[in-house]
Amino acid sequence: MNIKELAKKLGLSITTVSRALGGYSDVSEKTRERVKKYANKYQYSPNPYASTLASGKVKTVGYVLPIYGTNTSTLNQGNFFQFISGMSEELLSESIQLQILFAKSEKEELKAYEKLITEHKIEIIVLQNIKTNDKRIDILNNYKINYVAWGKTKDKRNYSWVDLDNEYAIEVIINYLIKKNHTHISYINISEKYNFANERKSSFLKNLKANKINFNPNYYASVKLEEPENSFEVIKKMLTKNKKISAIICSTEFSALSAIKACNYLNYKIGKDISIITFDGALVRDLSSPPITAVSFPVKELGKRAINILLNKNKNKNQPINYLAKTEIIERGSVHIVS
C-alpha cells in the first residue's frame, strides 16, 4: 500500500496522513492515533521521499531526455516515453514530481545533469543510455546524488540499475534463427560506446561460436547513434556484397526500418528471400508485409522498477539494487525457414 491509497481509506489528505505519521502537533492526537492504527493494519511503511510531504517539501526526480541522433525519431522516442510512463505512474502514487530537461547533444546532456543538481536542487535522478564508461555517473557520485540507471557500465560499478538482459536476448535470437536453419546471420548494432551494444555484440560472437558458426566481420556493422541515416547505406552495401546473408538482426527499430528499405530497394522479399528480426518492434511491425518479428521487453516495467528502487534504497541501507528484465520473441512472419 502507498500513502495515496492509505489517505483514501482514511478520507484524509496525503499531507495530513504524512504529518500524522511524522508526529506533527498540528494534527490532533486522535487523528494521529487513527492514522497509525490504519498504517499498522495495512502494513504501510512510509518511504523516505514521500515522507518529506510532512514538512511541506515535495521531492522531485530529475530526468534528462536526449533529443539528438536516433532520438529525434518517434521510432526511438517510443521507448523513452514508455519508460517515463512507468516512472510517472509510480511517482504519482507517492505524490512525487518528475522534472524533465531536454538535451540536443551529448555535451548539452552533461550540462543538463549539472543544471538539475546545481540550479534545480534535484537530489534524485534517473539516468538512461548508459555508456561503457559513463562520465555522468562520476558527476552524480561527486555530488553524492541518489540515482538509478537504466542500463549499466562495463565495470558494473557499485550503483543501482535496471536493464534488459542483453546477453540472454541475443542468445534467444540466435537459437531462434538457427532452429530455422539460418547460419549466415548479420547484425546491425549501434556504437559500442553504449554498454548495451557491447553486451549484445559480445553475446552475438559467443553464441555464434557456441553453435559452431564462424563469425564473418562483413556480416557485422555498428551505426553511430548520432548518425542514424547512415544505416540504410550500410545495410544496402552489406547485402549487396554478401549474397549469402539470410537473416538480419537489428539492435534498434531505426535500423530495422533501414533494413526494410534496403530489402525493398534490392527487391528482396522479407520473410521469403531474407529474414529480419528487431529489438522492440512495436513501431515498425506494420511497415512491411509480413510484419516484423521482434524481441519484446517490458520498458514500462523498467520505469516502474527504477522508481521502486529509488524509493526503497534507504530500507536496504543504501545497498545497490539491480533488476534484469527477460525478453520474449513475438513472431510476426518476417523470419523464414531456410530450406
Where in this protein do the model-derived segments appear?
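Hinge/beta->alpha junction and helix N-cap segments in small-molecule ligand-binding domains
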Residues: 70-80, 100-108, 162-172, 188-234, ...
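Amphipathic helical "hinge" segments at domain boundaries
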Residues: 45-111
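Flexible loop/turn connectors
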Residues: 232-339
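Short, well-structured alpha-helical segments in soluble
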Residues: 109-121, 231-243
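Short acidic capping loops at alpha-helix termini that bridge into adjacent secondary structure
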Residues: 183-184, 215-219, 270-276
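Flexible loop/hinge segments that line or gate small-molecule binding clefts
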Residues: 128-168, 254, 280-292
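N-terminal helix-turn-helix DNA-binding module of bacterial transcription factors
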Residues: 1-59, 339
